[in-house]
From Swiss-Prot:
May cause loosening and extension of plant cell walls by disrupting non-covalent bonding between cellulose microfibrils and matrix glucans. No enzymatic activity has been found. May be required for rapid internodal elongation in deepwater rice during submergence. The lineage of its organism: Eukaryota, Viridiplantae, Streptophyta, Embryophyta, Tracheophyta. SUPFAM superfamilies: Barwin-like endoglucanases, PHL pollen allergen. This is Expansin-B16. PANTHER family: EXPANSIN-B3. One of its GO terms (biological process) is plant-type cell wall loosening.
Amino acid sequence: MAAFSSSSSAPMLIRSVLFVSLLSAAFVFDSGEAGAAHRVVDPEWHPATATWYGSADGDGSDGGACGYGTLVDVVPMKTRVGAVSPVLFKGGEGCGACYKVRCLDASICSRRAVTVIVTDECPGGVCAFGRTHFDLSGAAFARLAVAGHGGQLQNRGEISVVYRRTACKYGGKNIAFHVNEGSTTFWLSLLVEFEDGDGDIGSMQLKQANSAQWQDMKHIWGATWSLTPGPLVGPFSVRLTTLTTRQTLSAQDVIPKNWTPKATYTSRLNFA
């Protein structure tokens, strides 16, 4: 009887061992570099690829598909900007989101991650066909390597990385609203800047002077939203709802009555 019990339990034991092996394998990303496999213990990290563009020590894109313009060339965005594939760009709704990116080859890669702010889109080439890809500034890409090996890493061109979302932090800055060129009392276009936390925008509403009604703004491209019914009467209050966690923030009378196109108006608050 004992021999029969041992024999019948063997298939169950084999299945258990196979299940554990497969489960363990699910947490291993093969970097494809230097023949090394790297274990990622945090399930928040996901596999992707990365390249770089511009000068080797450059800040990255000048402007970009999110519409941030010259903001990408100055602190706090300077050198931390990146273009992402459509999977992460999300038709512009991914603009402003922040990610930590880390490369995998232990022979050259730093253990620290680089924080990247989405400011642009890379729609074709290595970014096409549903791939998750980061096209980083030369400076950001080089910082993925251990000190003194940034140039060597850049010479590899495309590399394997892992990434995860992280909270955006703009060092004490409050959310600002840039009134885009061409705006009138019949067509108001706003660009959101320096949004802490999620960084992205799921919806945006505007309230006119002496009104209790919040009017839905339309996402038109990048990080730009607009409202067309007019005439519009300021001052304007603006309400943001983030795309990722649906947090809401209202900036009361943030845009004054005598607003002008191409001006930026800073609120007194930000997401925690």
